[in-house]
Amino acid sequence: MDGSVASSSVWDTQKVYKHHEQQNVAQTRPKYREGRRLKAVKVYTINLESRYLLVQGVPAIGVMAELVQLFALYGVIEEYRPLDEYPAEQFTEVYLIQFQKLTSARAAKRHTDEKSFFGGQLHVCYAPEYETVEETKQKLQDRRRYVNWASQNAAKLHSQQAEVNTESSSSTDTRTAEAPIMQKNPEEARRENVNSDYMGFPLLPLPPTADISYRLQNHFTQPSQLQWTKETTEDKMGSLHNFIPPVQKTSTQSESSSSSGVKEGDLRQKQKISTPSIRFMPRTTHLESRKRKLDEQTFFLKEADKTGVLIGPKLPELPKLDMEDSSLNVTANLIRNTMTKAASVPEAKPVQAKHTTPKPRRRI
């Protein structure tokens, strides 16, 4: 910092410093750093940053109030004034604005530099030469405090991530240690996995085949030894998407291992019962058979209701009035029967007349 600036007042220096000048566009910028706005690459340290901003290129048309309103969007402004004796271009003015916080000044410079303002282009730069010794000391202390806080947070996050990684690795090690290692005969393992899922994923359904399935009993199978089976496997909706065909294993039976042959025969018989062959049925045929079964069930239920014996108390019958005369009793019974017949007959709905449109007239 210049000694003359420190000894004099804050607002007295009118010297043009090198960092006040606008730099040219860097032509050596790499391709990946090129953007829409051609700006010089500039890195600011804490010494170069400041709460004081020097605004150049303001049109000299009395727009100080609008300028202050624009910069007030980014933070609290403590003080501002025009620098009349500062060398500037013709018909432009230079203003000095002091913000309350350094972050506000940083945001204001980033957003207002090279901004169009009332027909002119603003040039905003830091002015640390207007700071006092106390302000510079406070700025450095704040920066040191922020660096300590950021480094501590980074170390804490790193330690937490390391703990999480160690816990996950220890849990995986314990799981692998607890898991027992079972050694099985390859023939038994292959036999157990006949109708099971492979690697946790279900088997894909196979396309429908013919009704006849051939099952081989030995490696050398004769045509007379083929078995012909016809069994249904569709579900209630006539679909075969849940069907898994049986996998038959051919094994040679030795005379010495008779017990193993018996077990294998039992296993094949169970597989035959549990997983029959495929039979394809069209949906229309399935629906017709289902409807026929329902009709038969309802018919048998009605027949059972008619012929079945009723158990329990009967409902009280309607009281019959005695007219003390045979002719009156006959008339009353006739009226009563007619009323019951009329009540039992369903109401006839009125026939709606069809509205026919008149035929168009023929033209001669």
UniProtKB/Swiss-Prot annotation:
Gene3D superfamilies linked to this entry: 3.30.70.330
CDD domains: RRM_RBM48 (cd12442)
UniProt keywords, alphabetically: mRNA processing, mRNA splicing, RNA-binding, Spliceosome
InterPro entries: Nucleotide-bd_a/b_plait_sf (IPR012677), RBD_domain_sf (IPR035979), RBM48 (IPR039599), RBM48_RRM (IPR034264)
Residue segments, region Disordered: 157-191, 239-291, 343-364
Compositionally biased residues, Polar residues: 157-174
GO MF term set: RNA binding
Low complexity: bias regions: 247-262
UniProt similarity note: Belongs to the RBM48 family.
Subunit structure: Component of the minor spliceosome, which splices U12-type introns.
Known function: As a component of the minor spliceosome, involved in the splicing of U12-type introns in pre-mRNAs.
Protein name: RNA-binding protein 48
Biological source species: Danio rerio
Origin organism lineage: Eukaryota, Metazoa, Chordata, Craniata, Vertebrata
Gene that encodes it: rbm48
